[in-house]
Structures are given as C-alpha cells and as structure tokens.
C-alpha cells in the first residue's frame, strides 16, 4: 500500500500526455449520428500499453482534487441511455490493494475476449455534453480526467457512470434528477395520485305530476361533466315504465282525491272493499248484517257473549267445541246445496242490491248541504241564522242543492217540471215553499234548466225556434208544390202516350213538360238547400244552450238525416219502374226522392221544434216564478238576475262569523 501511494504522487509527463490524448478521444461526441467501432486488436494494444505504464509510473492524484471529486454532486441533464457503452471511472472501481498487479495481469487476458466498443448516439437527437474549456485559475473545478484502463478490475461492469455537468449552470434550468436520486426513489413506495373528489349528485324529490319525470334538470355545461357524474344523474331519474313508480302515482292521486272529497262515513262497513281486493265471496251472514243494522248489533253481542262463555271453564269449552264439530259438516252441506241450486246467488243478489241502495242514499245525503236561515228580532236589528246539522259542524257554507232531471226518452220529449223531494216523495214546489216559509226556513233548489235560464241561451233558442218555423213553412210549401208539379207531369206524359194533343193555356204539350221539368229541378234544389241551412243553425246554436240530455236528443235527430235520405232513395227506386221512353225519367226520379226526403225532414224538424219549445217555455216559467218570489211587497219592480249568479249577502251570525260565498 505504501508503494502504491508513493507512485500515485509521482508525475510522468509521457503518461499524462498519453492519457490526455485518450481523454480527448473519449470525450469526442459522435458526429452525424454514426456508430464508431474500435478494432479489437487496437483496444487490446492500448489496454496492455496502459497497464505497463501504470506499473512503471503510477499517476499521482492531488488530495484536494480527490476530495472535490468525491464530494461533487452528480447532476444529469439528459436521460440515461441504455445503449451507451460502459465507461469505467475510478470513482466506481474497487479500491486497489497490494495484489492489484496480479489482478491486472488476469484482466489483460480477459479483455481480449470482450466485444468491440460501440458508441450509440442518443435516440432523441440530443448531443452529449462537451467539457468546456477552463482557465488555469479554475483548474480545481474542472472535471477530473478518467483514469487509465489499467486501474480497473478485470471483470467488466454494466453500471453507467454519472454525467458531469457545469457547476456554474443556473439551478433554474430544466434538468432531470440524478441517477442516485432515481435509485433511491425506486426503493420508496409508489404514491398513487389522489383522486379528485366528485361532488355528490343532487337529489330531487319526485313530483306528484307524472309528466315532470321526463323534464329533469339538464346539464347545460357539458364540459365539466364526467361519465360517472352523468351516470349518477341518470340514476336519480324516474321512469314511468317502473311499476313501483306507477303504484306511487296512483297512491298519491288517491290521497289527493280523498283529501278533497268529503270525509267518509265511519260507521259504514268495509267488508265490500275487502271482498273486492281478496276476490272472495262475502259470507251470507256478513251480507245480512250489512243490510240490516239491527241484526248486525244483535249478532255482534251474541258472538261476544258466546266467546266469553266458551272461555269461562274448560268443561264448557269442550262441550261447545263438540257441538261445533257436529254442526259444521251440516252447515257445509247446506251451503253446497244452496250454491248448486242457485239459492245462494239469489240471496246474495237481493242483499247486495239492498246494500248498494242504502249506501248510495247515505252518500247522497252526506254530499248535500242546505242553506237555512231564521230571522230573529233583536235589539240591534241584526238577523241571526241557524245552521242546519251537518257532518262537520265547523264548516259554515251556503251551497244550493242541485237536483237533475230524469234521463230523456229516445222516442219522446221529456216533461220539464220542477219538483221538490221531501222524504223521498215528490211535492209541489209552491206547497213546499209555503211550508218552509211557515217554519222560518228557506231551501233553494235548482235543476238542469240553469243553462236555459241564461239570457244568451234563451236568445239562441228563440232564434232557432224562429228559424225552424220559417224553414218548416217553406218546406211545407215546397213539398206541396213539388207534389203538384209531379202530378201535372204524370198527366202530361199519359196524355202524350194516348196521342191526345191538347193545348194547355195556349201552349203546346212539349213546352208544358219542359216547363214542369225545370220547375221540379228548382223545387228539388230549394228543398235540399233549406234542409242544409236549418240543420246548420240548429247544430250551431243549440249545442250549449240546451241541457245535456236535450242536446243529445237533438243531435241524434240531426245525425239521422243522411240515413233518412238513403232510405227515401231506396224506397223510390224500388217502387218506381224505369221508363226508357221518357227522356226526363231521371229528373222525375230525383224529384220523387226529394219529395220523400222533404216529408221525413219536416217530421224530424217538428220534433226538434217541440224539444226546444218545451225547454224554453219551462225555463221562462221557472224564471217567472223566481221573479214573483223575489218581487218586493210594495209592488215596485227591481232588476232580477239569475239566482245562480247572485252573490250571497254578508250577514253576521251569532258567533260573529260570515258565511262563505
């Protein structure tokens, strides 16, 4: 070791010059990206020559330079290229020992078998760093020259050397980390990138309206929406195809209907609804108890007493169970016989009909509200009103009871008359009104004639009546004249066939027939035109003026006109025999069809006139009655408006409340 250190401090000019030339050749970058391959015998010769010079004249190294080289940081401006040739440096070589001479001799023989040295240019087109020229004053900062190849161990290594850079380069330059830092970083665990937290999807409660499910809030800004976010938005949407959604919608509609409607009767049995859901026949005992409330209470008390008696003692329980076991087969046999013979179905039909009628009566009684008032003489002159008993005593409303007329008969016009029902019996309205006035209570009743009570409706109906009268008279005259013209034409044709040429009114028979044909054509067109005009007037002015049942009947008559014309055409064609000798046979046939259609049209329009006249007369009578009832006692006239349009007066009650309008 002492010998080794002694020779390292010695300087040999020839060896330094040779090493300097080799350093320049080694640091020379490849030109034009071409591969440089050194001959194998030249590499061996250089290696052997350096080995001999190293043994004779070791190269001394200054201590300060050694310290600078060992403490200098390793910087890298270029990535490590795996294609670069291995460059051996003294910093990465093992320490030389006393037996280095023998090791060097062994490595000389091993180097002869190494492949040729190949320098590959970088793949990204970057040139390796060249050492900059330094001044003599900055000699200690200059990169140390590589040691001779003879200093290295005989076994080659694949470790890449550090790339020395200029220390004066600014730290702000973009540079890659060193190889040492990369090696240290590779041993550390890999840190996964922190995922960006996604905002939670906005939840919207579904609306009770089914159409709003299709109008979900749209994402106008599609740039920041991710696929996961869109998936979350789609997951909160509501589809009408989902059966659960449909069930929820139906349940909400039922709740809304129940909240708006009047409260149900708590005493009404629920067995009927349960039967509809379970699809099982209701027991006869339940039907009987539902139809007869007295029997229901008796059966319930008896059943309760029987249950208590059965649980009183074990002996009584065993005896009753024995009796039940004997009677149950008998009851099943009777039930089967009644089902097969049809007795059970008849009893069920009777009891079900009675139950339905009683329930309808109760519901109609609950839906009606009566406005009652009773004048009381007070000191303050205020009128006090007494309320009729209702299901909800807190509600003080004044609503008139609406009673509809019976349905129209398809064959006859209904009899319009106002009736007041008391206890299920029809009573004359005058007597009922006097009875109510005598008791101090006034009950206001209306009917489906409220549509005809309006001024616009009455004017429309009166206009239709006048039009029908005029058109009916015109049709009647046209029908009579057309019938007379047809008779004259038939007589003229018969006279011509008998060759009895008689002049009529000083004209020839041919001229008379021509005149009759023209008259038949005019009358036929007039009949069709009048029927068309009157049908349009009736359809346009009676649709909203008449009550629903009367309007349906009028519409039925109007729609039957085309069928009547078709029937008249068939009847005329079958009854008349074609006359090939008469050139005006087609005109005569068309006149016959128009005559038959005119007669049927007169019959239809007379029925429509009767319906409208009856409705108008009874509406006017009803208004006159109301006007007479509201006429003051002093006989002065005042403006009378329809009762349904009059607002209720605001009067104070006992508690100071004002009835609702």
From Swiss-Prot:
Source taxon at top rank? Eukaryota
**Summary of the knockout phenotype:** Leads to hypersensitivity to azoles. Accumulates toxic sterol 14-alpha-methyl-3,6-diol and ketoconazole in the cells.
Tell me the InterPro entries matching this sequence.
TF_Opi1_Ccg-8 (IPR013927)
List GO terms (cellular component aspect): endoplasmic reticulum; nucleus
Q: Where is the composition biased (Basic residues)?
A: 1-11
Q: Which cysteines are joined by disulfide bonds?
A: none
Q: Name one GO biological process term.
A: phospholipid biosynthetic process
Q: Name one GO molecular function term.
A: transcription corepressor activity
Induction, as annotated: Expression levels may be influenced by circadian rhythms.
List compositional bias (Pro residues) regions by residue number. Answer: 192-203
- Ranges of Low complexity composition bias in the record: 23-43, 107-140
Q: Where is the composition biased (Polar residues)?
A: 173-187
* Compositional bias of kind Basic and acidic residues: 357-366
What protein does this entry describe? Transcription factor ccg-8
- Which species is this UniProt entry from? Neurospora crassa (strain ATCC 24698 / 74-OR23-1A / CBS 708.71 / DSM 1257 / FGSC 987)
């Amino acid at each position: 070791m002492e010998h080794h250190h002694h020779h390292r401090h010695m300087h040999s000019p020839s060896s330094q010059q040779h090493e300097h030339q080799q350093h320049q050749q080694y640091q020379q970058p490849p030109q034009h990206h071409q591969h440089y391959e050194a001959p194998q015998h030249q590499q061996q010769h250089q290696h052997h020559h350096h080995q001999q010079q190293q043994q004779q004249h070791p190269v001394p190294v200054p201590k300060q330079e050694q310290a600078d080289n060992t403490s200098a940081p390793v910087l890298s401006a270029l990535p490590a290229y795996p294609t670069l040739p291995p460059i051996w440096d003294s910093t990465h070589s093992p320490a030389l020992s006393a037996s280095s001479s023998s090791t060097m001799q062994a490595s000389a023989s091993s180097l002869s078998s190494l492949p040729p040295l190949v320098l590959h240019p970088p793949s990204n087109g970057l040139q390796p760093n060249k050492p900059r020229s330094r001044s003599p004053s900055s000699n200690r900062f200059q990169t140390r020259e590589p040691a001779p190849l003879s200093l290295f161990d005989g076994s080659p290594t694949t470790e890449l050397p550090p790339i020395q850079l200029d220390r004066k380069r600014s730290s702000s330059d973009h540079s890659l980390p060193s190889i040492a830092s990369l090696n240290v970083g590779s041993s550390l665990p890999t840190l996964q990138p922190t995922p960006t937290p996604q905002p939670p999807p906005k939840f919207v409660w579904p609306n009770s309206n089914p159409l709003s499910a299709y109008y979900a809030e749209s994402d106008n800004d599609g740039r920041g929406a991710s696929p996961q976010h869109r998936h979350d938005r789609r997951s909160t949407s509501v589809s009408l195809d989902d059966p659960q959604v449909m069930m929820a919608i139906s349940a909400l509609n039922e709740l809304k209907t129940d909240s708006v409607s009047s409260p149900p009767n708590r005493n009404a049995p629920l067995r009927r609804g349960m039967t509809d859901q379970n699809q099982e026949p209701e027991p006869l005992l339940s039907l009987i108890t539902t139809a007869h409330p007295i029997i229901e209470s008796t059966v319930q008390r008896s059943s309760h007493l029987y249950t208590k008696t059965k649980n009183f003692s074990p002996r009584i329980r065993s005896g009753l169970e024995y009796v039940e076991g004997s009677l149950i087969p008998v009851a099943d046999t009777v039930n089967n016989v009644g089902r097969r013979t049809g007795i059970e179905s008849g009893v069920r039909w009777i009891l079900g009909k009675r139950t339905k009628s009683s329930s309808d009566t109760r519901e109609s009684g609950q839906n009606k509200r009566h406005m009652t008032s009773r004048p009381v003489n007070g000191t303050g002159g205020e009128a006090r009103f007494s309320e009729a008993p209702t299901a909800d005593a807190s509600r003080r409303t004044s609503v008139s009871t609406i009673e509809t007329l019976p349905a129209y008969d398809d064959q006859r016009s209904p009899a319009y008359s106002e009736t007041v029902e008391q206890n299920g019996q029809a009573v004359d309205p005058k007597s009922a009104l006097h009875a109510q006035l005598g008791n101090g209570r006034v009950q206001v009743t209306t009917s489906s004639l409220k549509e005809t009570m309006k001024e616009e409706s009455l004017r429309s109906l009166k206009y239709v009546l006048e039009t029908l009268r005029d058109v009916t008279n015109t049709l009647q005259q046209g029908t009579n004249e057309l019938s007379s013209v047809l008779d004259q034409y038939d007589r003229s044709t018969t006279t011509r066939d008998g060759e009895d040429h008689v002049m009529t009114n000083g004209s020839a028979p041919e001229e008379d027939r021509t005149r009759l044909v023209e008259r038949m054509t005019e009358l036929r067109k007039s009949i069709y035109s009048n029927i068309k005009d009157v049908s349009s007037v009736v359809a346009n002015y009676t649709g909203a003026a008449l009550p629903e049942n009367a309007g349906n009947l009028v519409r039925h008559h109007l729609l039957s006109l085309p069928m009547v014309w078709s029937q008249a055409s068939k009847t005329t064609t079958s009854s008349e025999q074609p006359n090939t000798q008469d050139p005006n046979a087609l005109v005569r046939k068309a006149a016959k069809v128009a005559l038959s259609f005119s007669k049927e049209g007169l019959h239809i329009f007379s029925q429509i006139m009767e319906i409208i006249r009856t409705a108008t007369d009874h509406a006017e009578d009803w208004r006159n009655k109301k006007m007479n009832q509201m006429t003051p006692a002093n006989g002065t006239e005042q403006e009378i408006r329809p009762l349904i349009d009059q607002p209720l007066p605001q009067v104070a009650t006992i508690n100071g409340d004002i009835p609702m309008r």
